[in-house]
Amino acid sequence: MKNFVKAAIAFSFLFLFQMHAQAQKLRAKDMVVTAHGWYGTDMERTRPNLKTYGYTTYEASVGFQTNPNDSSAYARQFGYPMLNFGFSLARMGEFKFYDQTKFSDLYSLYGSFERSLLRKKRLSLGYLLDFGATYNPNRYDPVNNPGNNWLSSPVMAYFGAGAFIKFHVGRRWEIGADAMFRHYSNGRLALPNEALNALGAGLFARYRLDDYDYKEYTGIPRIKADYKRGMQYMIVLGGGVHTCMAEWNAKVETEDDATKKSGIKLKAHPKLSISVDALYRYALRYASGVSLDVFYSSNMKELEASDRIVYGDEAVEKCPGYSPISVGLALVHEVYWHNLAVHVAVGAYPYRHKGVNGVEAKEAGDRERGWHYEKAGLRYYFPKLGDTFLGFAIKSHSVKAEYLEFSAGVRI
């Protein structure tokens, strides 16, 4: 499990650095330095032991501003985005509890993509996306910290998305404000994992080393886009590991107090998938289409046994059954930055037999039996290797993670 987490983090930063390297040739004069303060609140308002919901975050980042002098057609069509690499300190140790639960501060390394959608004199409006990894030193412990059932892993994934407004104060300085959604989770590598979702707002100040005047980002001749328009097909193999919420619920009901206090042990089950994607590339940045997905789950015997404990024999006998195979159909969209793609999919299952129905399971905190699913992740294409690619994504149900999937495939 530890090696799997390390591989996930290594994959994340491989993609981030590839994105940066392809943006433009790195030069000190294109650098920007940013300091950011942010205040957020936990979106989940039903945690019984939590007394206060707010916390502060402090961030520092170094980035590179793409510009019309030396950037590619991708940079032009994205409006000359900024690519940042930073460190954040989320002061979740500020949470106060009604019991003895303890939270610690979270430490994150991340990459950020910042794009201006509107530039008007000194004003810029746009959006930003963060991807990174987080270290959590004070996690769930059945003996010393049983109330922290949100974050149970030492290393987690971090994702952020938001909108910003900024003002150019002179040639080199910027000040601004943003509103962001932030998500911390281990991708169901371990339980309990209620995860943490937060909303908040912040202020930032930025110093630019580049000499390119912000007033000159409009009225620039269009750079010819070199891409292959038309249909493209992908064959994808994927896999990951998963801890099952139904098994957790069953053990909570059946284990004695001594076992619960010493820690409930869960097996991590392999998950496999094969997909065939058909996408139409209609712009340099975008391709959309459909995907046929076949998923394999290896824990059907354990799932049935757990359902008999949680829901009873009668509910299990009435259910459609327990098949390790599920078939999904999904709408797919990819957004490209050179050979890097953000890959998202929203799908439904025409065939899926996972025991008791989704409504009953969802009431028990198990959302993975629903009729629809989502995927969001990154792919990196290797044109010189026959258009093969590597990728990873979070597969989820109702935005609740099922597992972290690594994938490899070929585009034909």
Which ranges hold each PLM region?
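Glycine- and aromatic-enriched membrane insertion/assembly motifs of diderm outer-membrane
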Residues: R27, Y53-F95, A258-V332
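Residues that define the transmembrane beta-barrel architecture of outer-membrane proteins
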Residues: K29, G54-A60, G79, T101-L109, ...
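Transmembrane beta-strands of outer-membrane beta-barrel proteins
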Residues: M31-A35, P81-F85, L123-F131, I175-A177, ...
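Outer-membrane beta-barrel "beta-signal"
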Residues: V62, N197-T218, A401-I412
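Residues on the lipid-exposed face of transmembrane beta-strands in outer-membrane beta-barrel proteins
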Residues: A35, A60-T66, L109-R115, L129-A133, ...
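Short loop/turn motifs that connect adjacent beta-strands in outer-membrane beta-barrel proteins
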Residues: Q24-D30, N69-P81, L118-L125, V169-W173, ...
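Outer-membrane beta-barrel translocator domains and adjoining extracellular loop/strand segments
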Residues: R45-L50, F95-Q100, N138-N145, G187-E194, ...
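Transmembrane beta-strands of outer-membrane beta-barrel pores
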Residues: G37-M43, T66, F87-G93, F131-P137, ...
